[in-house]
């Protein structure tokens, strides 16, 4: 009541009478926008629980480190550091979210948003798997890994089919992918912005596709739906 009166230049006694005559006995707790609003609208919002809605944008191309910072900078309670809380069938925690804008209230648990996002991706992948034939021999885990590399390599959506074809061709011929974004991911969170020759020759980096054969052990970022489709429907190209 004091806060409402203070920001709306209303006498506190008058405000109490207003509440009494309108039979308003309690307010619902939460975060409210009271600035510049008439008192009647504020009282209505607080009585109905019309709290402020925030949004968080989970972008394609986001990795698990950036995501953790994004959550820490939001109004969410980060009870799910590095997706540790997610219930999933995948044997990795990177790149398992559906990119989109999600809405929440201040103090909501991040785990609820993240699990919802993961479940959306899982549903999409299940529908994709059963709706059409895969053009290559990759399983869903491998598709998600490769699509994340395509996501980080592509400058725009038009390039994704071509890039997917190049990587599928290399996999089919047992060639190394040689994708710079995988090296960078293996150096996180301490990558300084410059890939050095020693990084390219580093056999201890399990994400270094210049040194390892086949795919890295997990995705390197969240994939867009267009990247997933490019890999799922992709065929080895003659490149």
Task: Outline where the language-model segments fall.
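Signal peptide-directed extracytoplasmic domains
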Residues: 1-128
């Amino acid at each position: 009541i004091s806060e409402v009166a203070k920001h709306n230049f209303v006498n506190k006694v008058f405000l109490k009478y207003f509440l009494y005559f309108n039979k308003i006995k309690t307010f619902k707790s939460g975060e409210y926008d009271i600035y510049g609003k008439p008192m009647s609208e504020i009282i209505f919002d607080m009585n109905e629980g019309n709290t402020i809605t925030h949004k968080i944008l989970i972008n394609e191309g986001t990795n698990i480190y950036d995501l953790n910072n994004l959550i820490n900078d939001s109004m969410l309670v980060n009870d799910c550091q590095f997706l540790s809380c997610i219930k999933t069938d995948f044997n990795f925690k990177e790149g398992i979210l559906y990119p989109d804008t999600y809405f929440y209230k201040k103090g909501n648990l991040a785990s609820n948003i993240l699990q919802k996002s993961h479940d959306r991706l899982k549903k999409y992948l299940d529908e994709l798997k059963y709706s059409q034939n895969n053009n290559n021999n990759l399983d869903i885990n491998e598709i998600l890994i490769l699509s994340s590399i395509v996501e980080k390599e592509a400058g725009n959506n038009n390039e994704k089919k071509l890039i997917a074809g190049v990587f599928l061709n290399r996999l089919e011929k047992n060639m190394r992918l040689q994708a710079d974004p995988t090296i960078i991911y293996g150096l996180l969170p301490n990558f300084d912005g410059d890939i050095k020759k020693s990084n390219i020759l580093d056999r201890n980096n399990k994400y270094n596709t210049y040194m390892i054969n086949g795919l890295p052990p997990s995705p390197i970022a969240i994939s867009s739906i267009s990247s997933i489709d490019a890999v799922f429907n992709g065929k080895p190209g003659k490149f």
